[in-house]
């Protein structure tokens, strides 16, 4: 049974809650240690129709993972590619992410959280949320296999915080 504002529930009461926006269809994905074929298969298995590249510079020494090649190849699989440079992590802030659960790791994450407060980053986050409202699944891509070693974890946490603020 559908629920939402103005809809009668089984109890006969009207649901007066506002719309709840849930972004459980946004997930992180890294390409470290996988082939392009494995990467695409993971996207398909997760139902992704859009891949958002959150690398500052969408280039890679790994075959198939630079912006143009990646966009073309994903298109052949029915997956749209979007690069959001505004969500990239500057080179000078990356090393701290590798020292998991240390003061350097916390500092790198805190520094990146501050970057997400910029107007450009807020607009990019809003765009990701808009995509999540109209697409079955949205992948956020960077290099690192482990999310806790990547800034995309901070992005996903920020989206979840914003989602909870709406409820």
PLM feature spans:
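Compositionally biased, low-complexity intrinsically disordered regions
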Residues: 2-4, 16
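Residues lining hydrophobic/aromatic ligand-binding pockets adjacent to catalytic sites
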Residues: 10-167
């Amino acid at each position: 049974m559908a629920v939402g504002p103005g809809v009668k529930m089984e109890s006969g009461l009207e649901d007066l809650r506002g719309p709840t926006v849930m972004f459980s269809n946004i997930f992180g994905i890294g390409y470290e240690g996988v082939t392009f074929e494995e990467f695409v298969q993971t996207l398909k298995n997760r139902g992704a129709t859009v891949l958002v590249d959150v690398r500052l510079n969408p280039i890679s020494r790994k075959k198939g993972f630079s912006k143009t090649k990646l966009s073309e190849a994903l298109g052949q699989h029915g997956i749209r590619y979007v690069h959001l440079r505004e969500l990239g992590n500057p080179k000078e802030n990356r090393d701290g992410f590798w020292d998991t659960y240390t003061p350097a790791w916390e500092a790198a994450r805190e520094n990146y959280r501050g970057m997400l407060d910029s107007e450009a980053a807020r607009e990019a986050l809003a765009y990701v949320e808009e995509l999540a409202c109209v697409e079955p699944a949205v992948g956020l891509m960077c290099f690192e296999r482990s999310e806790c070693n990547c800034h995309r974890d901070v992005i996903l946490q920020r989206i979840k915080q914003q989602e909870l603020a709406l409820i």
